[in-house]
Amino acid sequence: MGKPEIGTTVVVDVPATTANLGPGFDCLGAALDLNNQFQLKVLEGGAERFELIIESKEGSHLRGGPDNLVYRAAQRVWREVGMQPIALEARVQLAVPPARGMGSSATAIVAGLMGANALAGEALGKEKLLELAIDIEGHPDNVVPSLLGGLCLTAQAASRRWRVVRCEWHENVQAVVAIPSIRLSTADARRAMPKQIVVPDAVSNLGSLTLLLQGLRSGNGDLITDGMHDRLHEPYRWPLIQGGSAVRKAAMDAGAWGCVISGAGPSLLALCPPDKGRAVAEAMEKSWEQEGVQTRALPLKLQSGGSRWRPKPS
């Protein structure tokens, strides 16, 4: 397969995601209308050259080089299609901050896969890109909705094939995400969890997930409230989030049906009626700032289109 011309640029828009939504640990996630944009430009040079330009203070600690997640994902595509690796520059408009539980690493993986596939003439289909994304990330709950959009339930069948179900999200369900200035790595959040679970906790989560999905489908707030309870990961992660319990209470007092940890945290996700969205966001911001934590809380819509790429005119 031929190498694209030097200077060829593709632009990839990748949405933020919120994962788990309480009981859907490592299988349920939703894309939200907050995007990272990646401009991937072909450079002169060999496979070890990857330059990274972040247009945000949030990502000032991120570095280029061959070990960068965007480039590692791109190389997976090129290996699959038998194409020689390309030197790249990535210019990133970063709206989804890293280490906040909003799927920032998933945006990097998906951007690398989609951008590299575009430069390879879209040689791989979406199902293969999904498989690669899950393999790189290690779990599907962020990368799948980031790639496909919407609310996605993903499970590995007995055949080892990944199965994705696009679930309904009623228009009367508003998501509010509070993003604090503090960080929490996914690795630290996973280390806090027990190595084994007990049967009653597993049964409880199965029931909660069923109620939650039905509540999201129908817009029934009572079902959402009952369905957002988790016993597998949240009890062990709340203590890691400074002021998190107070923020959750503030969201509920302002009219939220439920408030859970977004992904591994520390961002929090509240679900509420649309007319309560602004009040819930303001309550969450105020509560966290009373704890000394700068916070940005946003009412966000479900992003149903997933990631998109386009060529940038030269």
Swiss-Prot record:
Its EC number is 2.7.1.39. Keywords: Amino-acid biosynthesis, ATP-binding, Cytoplasm, Kinase, Nucleotide-binding, Threonine biosynthesis, Transferase. This is Homoserine kinase. The gene is thrB. It comes from the Bacteria. Its main location: cytoplasm. Belongs to the GHMP kinase family. Homoserine kinase subfamily. It comes from Synechococcus sp. (strain RCC307). It catalyses: L-homoserine + ATP = O-phospho-L-homoserine + ADP + H(+).
